[in-house]
């Protein structure tokens, strides 16, 4: 959009005076943020309405992206950038004497997700708007998100993340005209109506009111605005008597209170199922109502609507869609099923069997009795169809939806849709060959790969503005709208002046992070050290513990020889553990106690520092990632579906230290063997161990003095205050046979770390590697990923 500095200043002052009754000089940063965000909303609104009217008039096919998580972080700067007015606003603030950074930092991160799943969903919203496709998000308006992490005495403590603050979410708009009701619980019996149709009769069900809040998603440089719809829950006035107690009302409020409520109890499992169904049913109801306004037959809805299931949380969608089409709109089974399969598509995000969602059949039947009936019918018809094709009975049993008193949600998504995709080449291969091989034998045409991507605007233009400015000097600003122009940087990979400038920019980013570390933890770190970073969800398969084992080895090396020749190293962690995940919490405690041990030991001469930055989130990632020298991507080969932090680090010039897992393989293909450091077993070697059952971690431990010394450190009193946690980790590695092969990969990892040390000593070579990573990161833009989804799965047009 076009905006002069003078008009912006006038608009901003008017809104500040109108909303806050205050002058600029007297306003707090929060008041200034609220006024600025309201000003931006004023600019967005006509564009938003224009987009809505355009879609209604043109009746374009629209994709709806259902995800339990969306993790956009702060939205102010992204919205300003995408509108093309970021520089204008900064200039206006400078004239007003306002610090833009202070105002920007007054915004809370939108706490609607946890990790990569939510960040990917948010990136896709940005890319859909930027590429011009009609695509809307559908999720939950969590009041407290996952949790805010505090580290107390080394332990993770979870507190509510009250990200709404006292003023709410300035970006959202409540849409009362799209409110719908969602029924749960009760009994359902089937009866013939006056037309002879079998219809359900509900008794003793509970009714929830689903209230939509829309958040605009602005395209970069095109004034295009799509929509992220978030659902909140209310008790309908006409059903107030169904919720007579405070406890009953609280249980309703819990549905949209937090992401991933603890499911270790029956009540927790029930709440999760209700949460997932609530979001899915509400979204599908409004999609159908919107489609019917076009005056087209409902049986042809797939021609104008695509519903995408992001992981298994919304995988009840095919069954709920069938319920709506048949029970609410009188479609026959055949027409409803045809429309459902052609409308639905599904992204799988894991090969870990425990992460493929399953529900106890009795619990499911109790919460969603009619949907349960429909799932049984889908399952029975599937079994009959496959038997009619003379399939192996064992294959049929392996792939059915209802078995062993469980409902397999991934199976429902595959059978009830026309597409299933993995999120990296290796991941998709593993789905075909292993996790879902029986399904692949039945439906090979449904399987495809869509490697994940990231938003370059967030991670370069916003998070690393100094690097962006250096790139502008070299190749112009064309890359900002066409990321593939980054490849032009390769022309400068042997230019010493350019390499020196890139190295300087990285050092400046490290200095900014070092200041934050000192301020937030009290630990002083040197920017001359290698900043070695692992920031991601804490999970055993991601192997933060392997990183810690190496740190302990370095500690003992330095205790044995304080004069050891090594480049100083700062290991930086950021991670949240799921509240009920005891092992992950123990790893966090160990990292923090090792940090205390190392950072206070003056005999190490500052050569080794360990920092755990609490409450890892998008806005913190924007500070950490540009400052990283080394990107730790060390999951056990075959366990990480894709990863996206690896791409963000790559784009800002970190060198990837990685196993051949997920998208690391594709990063290696882009940068070449000389610009990445690979170690450890590949997936074939891991699978050979599984097949032969020949891995014996105690044997590795007992036969290797270095490993024994490191592992014993957990239980011999060297690390204070970890008696229970140290024993738990020791048991996991030795007694329980080291499930993720840390000890098997340990020596290869140590050698890779030594290679990092050697490479970093040659600053020019390191800067060249960094430049090559930046230049080839264009491969991983989510704009291209969305183009593939739109053309190959959703069949959309711009």
Language model: regions and residue ranges:
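A conserved ligand/cofactor-binding region detector
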Residues: 1-798
